[in-house]
Amino acid sequence: MIQVLLVTICLAAFPYQGSSIILESGKVNDYEVVYPQRLAPLPEGAVQQKYEDTMQYEFKVNGEPVVLHLEKNKGLFSKDYSEIHYSPDGRRITTHPLVEDHCYYRGHIRNDADSTASISACHGLKGHFKLRGETYLIEPMKISNSEAHAVYKYENVEKEDEAHKMCGVTQNWESYEPIKKASQLIVSTEQQRYMEIVIVVDHSMVKKYNGDSDKIKAWVYEMINTITESYRYLYIDIILSGLEIWSEKDLINVETSAENTLKSFGEWRAKDLIHRISHDNAQLLTATDLDGPTIGLAYVASMCDPKRSVGIVQDHSSVNRLVAITLAHEMAHNLGVRHDEGSCSCGSGYTCIMSPVINPDAMKYFSDCSYIQCWDYIMKENPPCILNKPLRTDTVSTPVSGNELLEAGKDYDRDSSANPCYDAATCKLNQGAQCTAGPCCDQGRFKEEGTICRRARGDDLDDYCNGISADCPRNPYHA
């Protein structure tokens, strides 16, 4: 069974109106201070993990109590995940760290169907969550021997540079005939795609973070954890296959010209990286200040191409979420997604991921246009490298019902008496059961077609069950 840890956070919340504090994200005004405290012990007989599979935190935001439900992002790393760095004499050093018991979670706020969360629990709680349409950031405060955390909105982070930041991709690439109607595009979990990526960190990043490889790794892991949530809405799993750090020097000429650097990176990937690490896509993360307002660039409709399934991203913000959105943006170009135009929407008042101008208030959602363009490209071009499902890293042992593990040969990992869909002796689905859980699953049966499973955001339309899946398919139409 997925081990459940119920944690209540006792929060003394103190809004600091007009005051400021220096946090990892920068100088922050108007924040709340909270003190997490674990009150509930582990269930009797449960095995203690360093980081539990499931956690719940209760706290107040603006005086209102909320419950944050978190689940470990078990698909974050590939089974053969590797890390590479270089010695002073130029030797390549490859390691395969144990990543099963990592500390990166995704989740939601209870009783808020539109909420999301992306949290690192490595050293306190750090990340962001969306509550009632508003995005909040949370991170530990830099106070010795204290459990204090700050909760705040991005708008309260003082901006050092107000200049517009843009993707360097232009709209003049060769286009293909789009599908005529959104209703022609029907995507389900059976068509899920799997994108294994490698992040390459250049030497300017090493200098920026003072050679602290642990800090660089945490920064990258947090970014990937964020974008996995964004890509779930496109039915694409993002898996980190490798992280390469150019610890001593750059292996290509990293220029301020985004075009030249992208070309060099693609050529290097084709002749070097692709032969060492199994992956579908590579992204270069640099602290080099690219020319003009450009903070990212990628080839369009290039997935699986050895030289062109690449992008570059400038580490342009101290707010991890903003760099993560830029990364998600460039990767989407590789999947055939163009920049959003005026008619594209991801909810009333929201700026979507594929806006050509990287908006500080951007949500981590793709627009209806992006959804259609991505799957139009996948269906027409059928890039083969994203078809294979990576191996899972779950524990494998003799299947025993109710033993807290999801093992080979079992459909379920909890005491089956708690779920009418399962046979307690075999941990297999009962005859006639269609599903176990999901927004369109009710007592082991798919909900009827037309049942609302996700309420609209703003002017968007509701999402409806299709009668053939437990998942809630995204409505391709928009208001």
Curated annotation (Swiss-Prot):
Keyword terms, alphabetized: Calcium, Cell adhesion impairing toxin, Disulfide bond, Hemostasis impairing toxin, Hydrolase, Metal-binding, Metalloprotease, Platelet aggregation inhibiting toxin, Protease, Secreted, Signal, Toxin, Zinc, Zymogen
Which positions does the propeptide occupy?
21-187, 390-414
* Pfam families referenced in this protein's UniProt entry, alphabetically: Disintegrin, Pep_M12B_propep, Reprolysin
Which cofactor is essential here? Zn(2+)
The cross-references to CDD domains, in alphabetical order and at most eight, read: ZnMc_adamalysin_II_like
Q: How does it assemble?
A: Monomer.
Highest classification ranks of the organism? Eukaryota, Metazoa, Chordata, Craniata, Vertebrata
Tissue localization of expression: Expressed by the venom gland.
One GO BP annotation of this record: proteolysis
Species assigned in the record: Deinagkistrodon acutus (Hundred-pace snake)
Domain Disintegrin, which positions?
Answer: 398-479
Cofactor: record remark: Binds 1 zinc ion per subunit.
* Name under which the protein is recorded: Zinc metalloproteinase/disintegrin
Family of this protein:
Belongs to the venom metalloproteinase (M12B) family. P-II subfamily. P-IIa sub-subfamily.
Positions of the Peptidase M12B domain:
193-390
Task: Tell me which residues this entry annotates as catalytic.
Answer: E330
